[in-house]
Amino acid sequence: MIKLGIVMDPISSINIKKDSSFAMMLEAQRRGWEIHYMEMNDLHLDQGIAIADTKVVQLKEDPNGWYEFTSEQTIELAELDAVLMRKDPPFDTEYIYATYILERAEEQGTLIVNKPQSLRDCNEKLFTAWFPELTPTTIVTRKAEKIKAFRQEHGDIILKPLDGMGGASIFRVKENDPNVSVIIETLTNHGQNYAMAQTFVPDISNGDKRILVVDGEPMPYCLARIPAKGETRGNLAAGGSGEPRPLSETDLKIANAVAPTLKEKGLIFVGLDVIGDKLTEINVTSPTCIREIEAAFDISITGKLMDAIERRLQAQA
């Protein structure tokens, strides 16, 4: 029997209709795996050995009570076959410390999804810089004058911090926006922080598509997040609405261009954000949208993920 750990935000406060981590655990349970639940404060190092206080959890698809802990124990993380790192951003120093603890278990043979080093290496906004031919025209800088020159050149641009999630602090700045200086000051913290500027992709009105890639294989369906009226952000957290749809040829082309690099880096479960024919983000920390896609189409994305984990465990054995 496979022992699967999961590090996540408190299970008591998830929305089971939308939560991808819950979907993953349900699939693991269906396979008879033993699921060890952890939060960040359950991870420790003791003389270089990764230790975890875990709770074995049973799940049911019931909005009145979706989980029950059946036992609690302190174990070496390496006793688990695999661990899903599903803690939501912020990607802060605490998150980074947790990846080091997970890496110690990885060195003893535990499969960590996604690979700790790659979680540190692949910032969700910046990692797209490795695929410039697929992205909107982009600069990353702290300097206000560079951002202003970029806007001068391109007219309609998007400004965003490198560490936001759910559409937080994303600004659209048009040609004669009187607020441009204060937006730049806010985002760069008066030149102390890097910010990203990108050309605006008008196709956002048709949705910001979330494409899931499992162990190098793009899933054939995506969730298009349509911005609320008058909004430029499709994120569900910013009031967008989700519309599951099959991948277009362009979507598939973009996903196939990125997928081999993801697989090679041990990024087994990744969410690509695509607007029109442009890649805007590569989400590696805890991508979501499984539930919405699985509800609309005859596909088990979680099944494919657990198959990939089984394959990798067999290859390691």
UniProtKB/Swiss-Prot annotation:
Residues 124-310 form the ATP-grasp domain. Binds 1 Mg(2+) or Mn(2+) ion per subunit. It holds the Pfam family GSH-S_ATP. GO terms for cellular component: cytoplasm. Its cofactor is Mg(2+); Mn(2+). Transmembrane segments: none annotated. It catalyses: gamma-L-glutamyl-L-cysteine + glycine + ATP = glutathione + ADP + phosphate + H(+). InterPro entries: ATP-grasp, ATP_grasp_subdomain_1, Glut_synth_pro, GSHS_ATP-bd, GSHS_N, PreATP-grasp_dom_sf. One of its GO terms (molecular function) is glutathione synthase activity. It comes from the Bacteria. Pathway: Sulfur metabolism; glutathione biosynthesis; glutathione from L-cysteine and L-glutamate: step 2/2. ATP binds at residues 150-207. PROSITE patterns: ATP_GRASP. Keywords: ATP-binding, Glutathione biosynthesis, Ligase, Magnesium, Manganese, Metal-binding, Nucleotide-binding. Mg(2+) binds at residues 281, 283. Gene3D superfamilies: 3.40.50.20, ATP-grasp fold, A domain, ATP-grasp fold, B domain. Its EC number is 6.3.2.3. It is an enzyme of class 6 (ligase). Belongs to the prokaryotic GSH synthase family. PANTHER family: GLUTATHIONE SYNTHETASE, RIBOSOMAL PROTEIN S6 MODIFICATION PROTEIN. This is Glutathione synthetase. The lineage of its organism: Bacteria, Pseudomonadati, Pseudomonadota, Gammaproteobacteria, Vibrionales. The gene is gshB.
